[in-house]
Amino acid sequence: MRTQAEEYNESDLVVGVIPARWKSSRFEGKPLVDISGIPMIRRVYDRACMAQSLDKVYVLTDDNRINDYCQRHDINCIIITELCRTGTDRCAHALKLLEGKLFVNIQGDEPLINPEAINRLVKSFDHSIGVANAYTKINQDYKFTDDNIV
């Protein structure tokens, strides 16, 4: 996580938020699925915490099982009780609860997210635009119509 104010005033917090829901239509319980002995949400959280551009990282959930795991393992977690259709909705609700100048939405099912990708996104962010996305170029035609690739 960030140790000094780079590109921002010291009071400008950069916050990583990781939406994590239990009732996924494709894979219920995905945040707590075991990946080589470690739940997915732990892997995502740990990788996000490696991003030097982030001051704080929070898991956002509507599920007590995920919250309980996070509390037992010293992971910052916030229960979002409002009905949210998407992870982005959950992040929008969290903005009302958290202090920060810039919020980075980190997908809860990216256990191998590269912390440097987060750093590059934060560093390149243009405050006059308001929103930025990191992405990977799709090179195979079939991936354009695959609902599992977003």
State each model region's role:
Residues 19, 105-107, 134-137:
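Short beta-strand segments
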